[in-house]
Amino acid sequence: MTTAARPTFEPARGGRGKGEGDLSALSKQYSSRDLPGHTKIKYRQPTQDAPEEVRARDFRRELEERERAAVKGRDRGAREHTTSSSSSSSSSSSKRPRLDQIPAANLDADDPLTDDEDDSGSDSDSDDDTAALLAELEKIKRERAEEQERKEREQKAEEERIRMENILSGNPLLNLAGQQQQQQQQQQQTQTKNTFSVKRRWDDDVVFKNCAKGVDESRKEKRFVNDTLRSEFHKKFMEKYVK
């Protein structure tokens, strides 16, 4: 008789299976992301601006040294550029034969003489353009200075006017015009108080007045109805949008 259909209870119990004699030695599965990653404290390195290093450093001296190095690099680049340009111009001039060195037999009437003349013409044109630009720049600076001076004069004149007005208004012996204006205002107020005429509105004599109101809302009785279909709002809404 086969025993394959018998219930196997022993393998179903944890720690009692094959090779698992201890209940505490259960199988466990770990992931690499579950393991501790940072197991050591990271300290600040010597070149990472520690507080002691920052206190000991002389920032002004470092800044001055960097500025001197930058100026030296700029000057060296400018000198190299000028030397290269002068060498290139000398080489080009040495390569180009001068007009007096060319024999008359090689000169042709159709050949344009555009070597030195073009260079001198381009130099003169560039000088003229530079002079025109400088003149325009000076003109713009002068106009801006004049505009700034004009604004300052206007501001000073306005401040002086306000100061004189404050002085005159604060002194009752000098503020005669202000006293006259106050007296005139008081007289007008007394005249308006003495007159019993009611001022009319500017739209009292119009023909069509309050045409859109219809029935006076104040005369209607205010009532509350606990029904949405018979409420005043619903009636107004239906009259306005449905009819």
UniProtKB/Swiss-Prot annotation:
- Tell me the InterPro entries matching this sequence: Cwf_Cwc_15
Residue ranges annotated as compositionally biased, kind Low complexity, are 84-94, 179-192
A cellular component term from Gene Ontology for this protein is: nucleus
Bias (Acidic residues) occurs at 108-130
Gene Ontology MF annotations: RNA binding
Report the Pfam families cross-referenced here.
Cwf_Cwc_15
User: What is its subcellular localisation?
Assistant: Nucleus
> What are the start and end residues of every segment in region (Disordered)?
1-159, 176-196
Predominant location:
nucleus
* Complex and partners: Identified in the spliceosome C complex. Component of the minor spliceosome, which splices U12-type introns.
Q: Tell me the protein's name.
A: Protein CWC15 homolog
